[in-house]
Amino acid sequence: SALDRLNARTDELIDQLGLGTYRDHRAADLSYGRKRVLEIATTLALDPQVLLLDEPMAGMGREDVAMVAGIIRNVATERAVLMVEHNLSVVADICDHVTVLQRGEILARGDYATVSADPRVRTAYMGNDA
């Protein structure tokens, strides 16, 4: 039945995203990082071809950032991921292609090494001394 398929998909995502320990917890009782993982899981339950993420690392501590970055990296093997993110170490670690915007205009695009070396990007996002 449809409910059986939904329950099976839910169990698969819970295990895939490392939420098994929290299976019987209320979402409100989860840590901030685990709540973000749950948000990703609810989106993945719909099996999208493209996963859109807006600042997925915002407000997270280093440990949660590493956990969520790993999940996004794994998810990206099965679908396209479009992510807005200001944590440059995460961008460097996860992204194959980077587009930098400034005031709605494309400032630079390419792989992280190319984009991060662009003087306009360095001035705009990393400061003049970067």
Give residue ranges: language-model regions.
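Glycine-rich phosphate-binding loops of nucleotide-dependent enzymes
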Residues: 1-130
